């Protein structure tokens, strides 16, 4: 049986993550308050960020930037800005 959470990103009840995917207190906050769907949306944005900004996960500054973007996206409602990227219009 899956667990449900009130997803802070979606602002509604949704299926929660199966396990904590990120370490520490932030990981617990994500596990308790972010849905699978929202995490999937973040993973798409994260991939774009890493590729477009050529982030190196061995670099502590790059990891810190990515973590801040994750918090902004999941908890503060701020979209990820990637220069030159124009999202497709939805009808």
Swiss-Prot record:
GO terms for biological process: cellular response to oxidative stress. One of its GO terms (molecular function) is iron ion binding. It comes from the Bacteria. SUPFAM superfamilies: YggX-like. Keywords: Iron. GO terms for cellular component: cytosol. NCBIfam families: PRK05408.1. Could be a mediator in iron transactions between iron acquisition and iron-requiring processes, such as synthesis and/or repair of Fe-S clusters in biosynthetic enzymes. PANTHER family: FE(2+)-TRAFFICKING PROTEIN-RELATED. Belongs to the Fe(2+)-trafficking protein family. This is Probable Fe(2+)-trafficking protein.
């Amino acid at each position: 049986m899956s667990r449900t959470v009130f997803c802070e990103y979606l602002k509604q009840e949704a299926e929660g993550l199966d396990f904590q995917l990120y370490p520490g207190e932030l990981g617990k906050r994500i596990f308790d308050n972010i849905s699978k769907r929202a995490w999937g949306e973040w993973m798409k944005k994260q991939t774009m960020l890493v590729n477009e900004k050529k982030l190196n996960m061995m670099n502590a500054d790059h990891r810190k930037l990515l973590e801040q973007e994750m918090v902004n996206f999941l908890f503060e409602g701020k979209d990820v800005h990637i220069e030159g990227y124009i999202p497709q219009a939805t009808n």
